[in-house]
Structures are given as structure tokens and as C-alpha cells.
Swiss-Prot record:
It is found in: Secreted. Residues 1-18 form the signal peptide. This is Probable beta-galactosidase A. The active site is at E200, E298. Cleaves beta-linked terminal galactosyl residues from gangliosides, glycoproteins, and glycosaminoglycans.
Length: 1007
């Protein structure tokens, strides 16, 4: 092992001596006090040292998942996601709050129905999941405006600064959401253990003071005023030391940062660039914040995908099970004490809530799919890691050392980072020195153990590390009082039951492994063939060697049964904590010990004992053998999803049964055959259209970043329109000298726009992911002098920009018309009107929120909601597969019934066909029961399949689907195909409660 650098050694020595440390880092002066108890704490429930948090006095590794409930607007499904997180072996969830969804109008905070947070907090509490609250006010999150409401574009001050106008604007939101979070803190019996002020406060420019200690202290104090007393934690965008403990005003209690080491090149999922695996984060942590636990508040487990990208399945491959094995185990080598994976469940950018850099799906290539399915192997791999950490309290007591490729192996092709314990177990994280290597490399280990330095395997043969894999080898590992002297196979879990101990080990295909137990007991093979297993007593330890096989084998040494599994078999094992019928305890040492091991395939949600009955709730996607290992002594009967299951008990005490799988026949309607009704949703292009009720575009802008180049503002947010399609009408009197019209529109990446002159189509910008704005020039027909004409302009607002760099105020980039020029005229010759969603910030549909609707005629009238007035004379029978024969926008709606059998979780998608080459330029908005659940851009993509969850879809009744079809080319547009399809039905214990689906009602004052 190489010696620590002089500075690091001195730092550690000073810590040990209890000396306060002062040092310089990146321009900051950092003063670290080594004793966390001497910091002023506002509560006693959550404390910490340099290794981990303590919750109620018990040391705990926080292994968490990032999920955003607001990206799944069906609160009853939040429990489903949280159960799937708990089943990973995780104990925590980190979440953002999207301010834009809660305060669509300044001063009016609304958090009801799908926007209420109480069901989420209650579910986390019921399931024993701690929460890290990250309400911003700025969140980034690939959300429109980075979570900022659009009305901040009118703010006369710099966002995320100490400008009083900005601070005042945040008060209503923070007082409400902060107050609610405060009620659910651990101090009040709730699940919230940490609070993050702001997010990624890591970069500034343009003359703004950065970092600004006054600003950040205000954000912290603001939370404290709302009642927040749990420790604060930061999320620096890189380990830059911003607001670290000891930096003075604006410092947080616990420093953390994020990291997305493999990046976002989903088009090349097999490419792992040289140098992308972090190796120095432990050293950086010791420089920045040595007396707090190392915290990775966001660590990559998926990737975002832009408009025109390769799609999220490619992102899932980029950050798949191999990525998890190498990169996540690498984080363990740093001694990470707080780790949250972004995104463990991504969800959907429904209702225009996404930023312009992404499309409707926010699947993120996550372990839990957008559809809530857990069929990606990366979910199962993550479960192995989560349960290992949950079973290994000694990990937090081990001290990380320096990586080396010579000390612990016999080959320089491999690198090992040790975490050395002092009687509490040691961990050796092994990977290829070239982390991207796909070679299979044989090796031997040289490990320091309590029995001395050992060369492993001791019984002959060789270990092997396959390509893009990593191992955590163990030394002096405690299993309920039995010492595992070493294990080359990896631990999934272990438990002490009333009739003995169980240790579950696994290995990859083609691997050879060896285990030594400090015991003089004999080895018995109690299940499976013993011919592939060898053993020997060596200096007071039983050494067992085996080759990994698909068939399970169980070896018994004294009162310890060791399950030898291959990795794919281990994927089918679950370790639910025993709870009650309605709740699961938090992952305390006692609660973790009170768990059972279940082999059951797709998903095990909960386990509890009621009287003499052991109850499991579980999901199945195939006929599945179910085994219970370590059934409680008091249990006699087995119930699965409330039904008694006949079971047998073998000689090893394992309960066995089988759950059948007979999926129901699912008959979905053929969308092409529905009784579609349509209406022109762009009547504004007709010269006779009366726009007198529309707002006049007569304001000067309040935008402080983008000065006007037009006589009056044509920035939509100046008038309260922040979401969806925007419409402008410009009136002028011709003088006969008009020859062309130039217009610069801006809607964000991949936006589109179209222009008409008094019913004559002039042209469109069809969109490109590389363009946020576009300047087009259109040739005009001959105009008659003295006659009134009107331009009609449609702009697709793809969401507001995020606001990452302080001082740029990127979220203030306007949407609408930036500039225009009509030949032969002054700009002031044109008088403009505009509209967006009906009511703007006084939006009508409070159930579906402030961003759900855009400015099209049908949207303004609410025709996208169930039961629109299709019998009026303006409607005709027409389908989107017939479409339009010329440029324009039509609206189509139809109803259909579903009858999905209860007890089955069935993913359902709306799928658009795209078979024409080159792809015609048209845009579609998909509404389901009034909720906007898709923006489809045919000529850009990539998304063609749009999942809609149960709860938005009525699985047992009538549903309404609506689409807007915008033809941006002279030949018009029609859908190639439009289908309703389903995924694999899962037999489930899940119970889904639908959300409110308000019907169409005539809107007062609508135009």
C-alpha cells in the first residue's frame, strides 16, 4: 500500500487529535471542527461523524433513490414505486419539488390532488423509507425553467441571487412547502432526515458575486424559518467545495456533490471513454469536508436523452448492469456514506413540465422503467448491491485506502482499493486497471486477514474477473458471530434465524470462488451435488472452493448454511423486512435482522406475520416457484397476496410453493375504428376570425436579460403565458410595397412555428434540436393597398430553459416572437394580439395544474377533456389518420372503453407510426382524459410510444383520447398509424386509485 500524501496524513492526524483545521481550497477558507457534537444542532435525531449519519443514535449508510412524484400524477402509484425502491435494499429516497407546478400564479400556492405531497410522505413513512427533501427553490431536474415558474421571467432582479425581488418571490413557495416538509421531519415522527437548500449552486458569471454567502445563507435561513431543523446538505455539481462546512456564511451541515461519470452519449452505449472513472474523490473529500460523511447526493444510474436522440433503451444500455458493477462499487471504494442514485425512477414529462432539451418520456434509462416495470437487468443488479450494503454494517467502519494494482493481486491488469477494518471486516474493491476492459483476466489475491497474509485461492485454481465487472472481496466479515475469514464470492445477504444462520453468496458465469470460515466444523453439502465442491481445514479455518453453476448448492458449516448461487439465480431473491399489514419499519439494525429471505421471481413487496400466518405480497410475470428461507418460528401457514398457499417444508427448513400465472385476455380497442370527431383548432388563420377578446400585446417587457427589438413585447411570459402552443395575430394596413416578411421566433430546442397571412400559408420552421430560435423570411403575395391584413403565427413552446449558471438568467429566455420585419413598413405598423393557455396564470383547470394546456382553440375551450360538445355544428366526423390536406391544425377526439381484470398491472401505450421516409413534418399533442401525456414530433423523434398509467387511464370504464395534429408542410399531414398497445401483464398485489378526471364544462369568457 502506498503511503498517504503528507497533507492527507497530517489532516488525519489532526482529526485524531481533535484539532480544528483551517486550510485553503479553491479560494475558500475551510475551518473543520472534528467533533460533530460540538456543532450547534437544532435536533438530536440525525447526527453524523466523518463516516456516516447516525439516526436515533444508530450508525447508518444512506443508500437512496432519486424519484420525482410529480412526474407520475397518480398518488396511489407512488406507493408502488417506493415499494420497489425498498425491495432494492435501499433505505432512502431523495426528491425534488417543482415550484412551477405549485405556484402557477404569484401568491397562489396550490398543492391538492395530484400535486399534494402528503400521500408521498405518508407512503414513505408507512414503508420505512427516509427522505432527503430537495425543494430548491431551484432544482434543475430537466424541468421547465429548472422548476422556476414562468412568471419569474418578469422579475426585476437576478435569479438565484441576493436581489431582494428574487428572495421575496420565493417566500410564499418556501414558507408553504418548507412548512409541510417540516411537519414530516423525523423530529415529528416523519421520514425527512435531511434538507437540501437550492441545487448545484456551483457556477456564476456575468458580474454576479459567486459564490454569494449572503444569498445561500438566506436560503438556509428561509428553510429554518419554515420550521426545518434537520441537517442541511449540499449538492455541488462537482467536488468544488462550494458552501462546505467551515466556509463561513452560507455553509451547510454536510457537504455533498453529484457525479455523472459516464456522461450521456446514449448513441454509443458500449463506449466507456478513457479516464471517466473517478479515482480521486476520497482525497478530494478529505480536502473539502473531512469531518462529514462522504456524500454523493446525485450519482448516475441513468442518462437523459434529447430530441432526436437514440432513445432511452440506449441510455439504459449505457448505464446498465455492467456500469453499476464497475461504477457503483467504485463509489464504495471511496467510503461513501450517503449515496443517492439519479434517476432510480424517472417518470413522464406530462403536461408540458419538461425543459426544451428533452421530450415527453423521462424514463432516463432508469432501473425502474417509466411504465414502473422492473424488467431491466440493472434493477436486479442494483438489488444485489443494495442488499449487500444493508447486510454489511462493517463497511462504514472500514477506512478507505489507496488504489493499487500490485499490492493485492498478482497482475497489474487489475486494480484493488482496500477499505481496511479494525476487527470489523475489510473490503477489497477489485476492477480492471483499464476500467473499460472487456477481457477475462485470471488472478490470485494476496489479502491481509486475522490469520495472516494469505494467497487466494488456497485450494488451487485461479480466480477470474470478466470484462466490465468488479468485485468486492471480503476479509474478516462477521455473520452473526461467525467469522468469514475471506470470501471471493460476493455477498447478497445474510441472516440469523431461530434455527441457524444463512449466508447467500453469488458469482458470475465461468467463475471459480473460494470461501474460508473460521471454524473447525465439518463441511456438509445439504442441497445439490457435492462433486463440484472441495474443502479443507487450514490453520483453524474451513476452506471451501467451487465453480459457479446455475444449480443452487447449500453448504453447511456448523450452524451456518451457505447458499452458493450464480448471479442470475441471485436476481430472484428478495429480503423483505417483517412489518405489519400496513407498515414496514425503517432499516434499523433490529428491523434489518427481522427479515426473511424469499426466492420469488419478479417482485416481493412486503412480508408480515399475523398470528400463525406469514403473509407475502408479491408480483408475478410467470409461473413462479416461491421459497421462504427463515420463516418465523411462530408461522405455520403461508399466504400470498391474501390467499392461502399450500407449501411444503424441506429438510433445510425451506418453505416451498408455486404461484401460477395465467394472464387475462386483454382486448384493447382499435383506435382507427373509433367514432372520431374533429374540429378546426386553428380558426385564427381565417380573415374573418374575431380576436378582439384576446390580450393586446402592448406591454413593454419586464425581462431584464433580453431587451426588446420590437415596439412592444411579444414575449409570452410578459402576458402570463408560460406553457404549450402560443398564438400571435399581427394586424396591419397594406400599402402595396410589401414583398417579404421576416420573423424570428423562439420556442426552445426542437420547436416549430408556422405563419399565415390572412388565410394564406407562408411557411414553417419544422424544427431542429440544435436550434432554440429561428429567423425565417417568407415571400408575400401581392397585397392591396389600404386593405387590412393579419399575420397568424403559431409557436411551439417546448418549455423554459433551466437556470444553472448564476448571472445568465437562462430561464428568462423568452418564448414567442423576438423580432420581425415587414418590407415597406415600420415595425410599429403592425399591432399584435396574443394568447396561450386560457386564463394564463389564472388557469381554469386546477386539477391538472398550470402547465397542462396550451393556447390552441380546442385547448382554450377545454375540448381535450372528457365528453366535449361534439354534437354542435362545428364538429365533423374525421380521424387523425385522414388528417389534413393542407397546413393547419386540427383537433380530434373519441371515446373508448377498457375492461382490464383487477389484480393485474398492465402497461398501456399510445403508439404513433412513423414509416414514411423522409418523415413528414407534423406535431401531435396527446390528451388522455384531459391530461396531456405526449408531445410527438414526427420529423425529429425519437419517441413514438407514450405510456399512460392506470389512474389517468380508467382501466374499468370509459376513456377519452384527443390529439391535436399540426401540419407544418404544404401537403398537410396525417398519422401513419395510431394504436393502443399493452405490455406484459403482471399479476399484482397493487391497488390503484384513479385521479380526478373533470369533464368538459363551458368556460366563461372563452375565446
Amino acid at each position: 500500500m502506498r503511503l498517504l500524501p503528507v497533507w492527507t496524513a497530517a489532516l488525519l492526524a489532526a482529526q485524531a487529535a481533535g484539532v480544528a483545521l483551517t486550510h485553503k481550497l479553491n479560494g475558500f477558507t475551510i475551518t473543520e471542527h472534528p467533533d460533530a457534537e460540538k456543532r450547534e444542532l437544532l435536533q438530536k435525531y440525525v447526527t453524523w461523524d466523518d463516516k456516516s449519519l447516525f439516526i436515533n443514535g444508530e450508525r447508518i449508510m444512506i443508500f437512496g433513490a432519486e424519484i420525482h412524484p410529480w412526474r407520475l400524477p397518480v398518488p396511489s402509484l407512488w406507493r408502488d414505486i417506493l415499494q420497489k425502491v425498498k425491495a432494492l435494499g435501499f433505505n432512502c429516497v431523495s426528491f425534488y419539488v417543482d415550484w412551477a407546478l405549485l405556484e402557477g400564479k404569484p401568491g397562489e400556492y396550490r398543492a391538492e390532488g395530484s400535486f399534494a405531497w402528503e400521500p408521498f410522505f405518508d407512503a414513505a413513512s408507512d414503508l420505512g423509507i427516509y427522505l432527503i427533501a430537495r425543494p430548491g427553490p431551484y432544482i434543475n431536474a430537466e424541468a421547465s425553467g429548472g422548476g422556476f415558474p414562468g412568471w419569474l421571467q418578469r422579475l426585476n432582479g437576478t435569479i438565484r441571487s441576493s436581489d431582494q425581488s428574487y428572495l421575496d418571490a420565493t417566500e410564499n413557495y418556501v414558507s408553504h412547502i418548507g412548512g409541510l416538509i417540516a411537519k414530516y421531519q423525523i423530529t415529528n415522527g416523519g421520514p425527512v432526515i435531511l434538507y437540501q437548500p437550492d441545487n448545484e449552486y456551483s457556477g456564476g458569471c456575468c458580474g454576479q458575486e459567486f459564490p454569494n454567502p449572503d444569498y445561500f445563507q438566506y436560503v438556509i435561513d428561509q428553510a429554518r424559518r419554515a420550521g426545518i431543523v434537520v441537517p442541511t446538505i449540499s449538492n455541488d455539481a462537482w467536488p468544488g467545495g462550494h458552501n462546505a462546512p467551515g466556509t463561513g456564511k452560507g455553509e451547510v451541515d454536510i457537504y455533498g456533490h453529484d457525479n455523472y461519470p459516464l456522461g450521456f452519449d446514449c448513441a454509443n452505449p458500449d463506449v466507456w471513454p478513457e479516464g471517466n472513472l473517478p479515482t480521486d474523490y476520497r482525497d478530494l473529500h478529505l480536502e473539502i469536508s473531512p469531518s462529514t460523511p462522504y456524500a454523493l447526493v446525485e450519482y448516475q444510474v441513468g442518462a437523459f436523452d434529447p430530441w432526436g436522440g437514440p432513445g432511452f433503451e440506449q441510455c439504459a444500455a449505457l448505464t446498465g448492469y455492467e456500469f453499476e458493477r464497475v461504477f457503483h462499487k467504485n463509489t464504495f471504494s471511496f467510503g461513501v456514506g450517503i449515496l443517492s442514485l439519479y434517476m432510480t425512477f424517472g417518470g413522464t414529462n406530462w403536461g408540458n413540465l419538461g425543459h426544451p432539451g428533452g421530450y415527453t418520456s423521462y424514463d432516463y434509462g432508469s432501473p425502474i422503467k417509466e411504465t414502473r416495470e422492473i424488467t431491466r437487468e440493472k434493477y436486479s443488479e442494483l438489488k444485489l448491491l443494495g442488499n449487500f450494503i444493508k447486510s454489511s454494517p462493517g463497511y462504514l467502519l472500514a477506512t478507505p485506502g489507496k488504489l493499487t494494482n500490485t499490492t493485492y493481486t498478482n497482475t497489474a491488469d487489475l486494480t484493488v482499493t482496500p477499505l481496511l477494518g479494525n476487527g470489523t471486516g475489510s473490503f477489497f474493491v477489485l476492477r480492471h486497471s483499464d476500467y473499460s476492459s472487456q477481457a477475462s483476466t485470471p488472478y490470485k489475491l494476496r489479502l491481509p486477514t486475522s490469520a495472516g497474509q494469505l494467497t487466494i485461492p488456497q485450494l488451487g485454481g485461479s480466480l477470474v474477473l470478466n470484462g466490465r465487472d468488479s468485485k468486492v472481496h471480503l476479509v474478516d466479515y462477521d455473520v452473526a458471530g461467525t467469522k468469514i475469514l475471506y470470501s471471493t464470492a460476493e455477498v447478497f445477504t445474510w441472516k440469523k434465524f431461530h434455527d441457524g444462520k444463512v449466508l447467500v453468496l453469488y458469482g458470475g458465469p465461468g467463475e471459480h470462488h473460494e470461501l474460508a470460515v473460521s471454524s473447525k466444523a465439518k463441511v456438509k453439502v445439504v442441497e445439490g451435488l457435492g462433486s463440484g465442491i472441495s474443502s479443507k481445514q487450514i490453520r483453524g479455518a474451513v476452506v471451501v472452493a467451487w465453480d459457479v453453476e446455475p444449480a443452487r448448492r447449500i453448504v453447511q458449516i456448523g450452524d451456518l448454511k451457505i447458499f452458493l448461487l450464480d448471479r442470475n439465480s441471485a436476481y430472484n431473491y428478495w429480503v423483505p423486512q417483517l412489518g405489519t399489514e400496513t407498515s414496514i419499519p425503517y432499516a434499523t439494525e433490529k428491523a434489518v435482522a427481522a427479515s426473511v429471505i424469499v426466492k420469488a421471481g419478479y417482485l416481493v413487496r412486503t412480508a408480515y406475520v399475523k398470528g400463525r400466518d406469514l403473509h407475502l405480497t408479491a408480483d408475478f410475470n410467470a409461473t413462479t416457484p416461491v421459497e421462504v428461507i427463515g420463516a418465523p418460528k411462530t408461522a405455520e401457514n403461508l399466504f400470498i397476496n391474501g390467499k392461502k398457499a399450500h407449501h411444503t417444508v424441506d429438510k433445510n427448513g425451506i418453505w416451498s410453493t408455486e404461484v401460477g400465472y395465467s394472464p387475462p385476455k386483454i382486448v384493447l380497442p382499435v383506435l382507427e375504428d373509433l367514432k372520431w370527431k374533429s374540429i378546426d383548432t386553428l380558426p385564427e388563420i381565417q380573415p374573418s376570425y374575431d380576436d378582439s377578446p384576446w390580450p393586446d400585446a402592448n406591454l413593454p417587457t419586464k425581462n431584464t436579460i433580453y431587451p426588446l427589438r420590437t415596439p412592444t413585447s411579444l414575449y409570452a411570459s410578459d402576458y402570463g403565458f408560460h406553457t404549450g402552443y402560443l398564438l400571435f395575430r399581427g394586424h396591419f394596413t397594406a400599402n402595396g410595397r410589401e414583398s417579404n416578411f421576416s420573423i424570428q421566433t423562439q420556442g426552445g430546442q426542437a420547436f416549430g412555428s408556422s405563419v399565415w397571412l390572412s388565410g394564406t400559408y407562408l411557411g414553417s420552421w419544422t424544427g431542429d434540436n440544435d436550434y432554440q430560435d429561428y429567423n425565417a423570411t417568407y415571400t408575400l403575395p401581392s397585397l392591396k393597398a389600404g386593405k387590412e391584413y393579419v399575420f397568424t403565427v403559431v409557436v411551439d413552446n417546448m418549455g423554459l430553459n433551466e437556470n444553472w449558471i448564476v448571472g445568465q438568467d437562462e430561464m428568462k429566455k423568452p418564448r414567442g416572437i423576438l423580432n420581425y420585419e415587414l418590407s415597406g413598413h415600420e415595425a410599429s405598423d403592425i399591432t399584435w394580439k396574443l394568447t396561450g393557455n386560457f386564463g394564463g396564470e389564472d388557469y381554469v383547470d386546477k386539477v391538472r395544474g398550470p402547465l397542462n394546456e396550451g393556447g390552441l382553440y380546442a385547448e382554450r375551450h377545454g375540448y381535450h377533456q372528457p365528453y366535449p360538445p361534439t354534437k354542435s355544428k362545428d364538429w365533423k366526423s374525421s380521424t387523425p389518420l385522414t388528417g389534413l390536406s393542407k397546413p393547419g391544425i386540427s383537433f380530434y377526439t373519441a371515446s373508448f372503453d377498457l375492461d382490464i381484470k383487477s389484480g393485474w398491472d398492465v402497461p398501456i401505450y399510445f403508439e404513433f407510426g412513423n414509416s414514411t421516409t423522409p418523415a413528414p413534418a407534423y406535431r401531435v399533442q396527446l390528451y388522455v382524459n384531459g391530461w396531456q401525456y405526449g408531445k410527438y414530433v414526427n420529423n425529429i423523434g425519437p419517441q413514438t410510444r407514450f405510456p399512460v398509467p392506470e389512474g389517468i387511464l380508467n382501466y374499468k370504464g370509459t376513456n377519452w383520447v384527443a390529439v391535436t395534429l399540426w401540419a407544418l408542410e404544404g401537403s398537410g399531414a396525417k398519422l401513419d398509424s395510431f394504436k393502443l398497445v399493452h405490455g406484459i401483464p403482471v399479476r399484482t398485489a397493487l391497488d390503484v386509485e384513479g385521479v380526478e378526471l373533470p369533464r368538459y364544462q363551458s368556460r366563461k369568457g372563452v375565446y
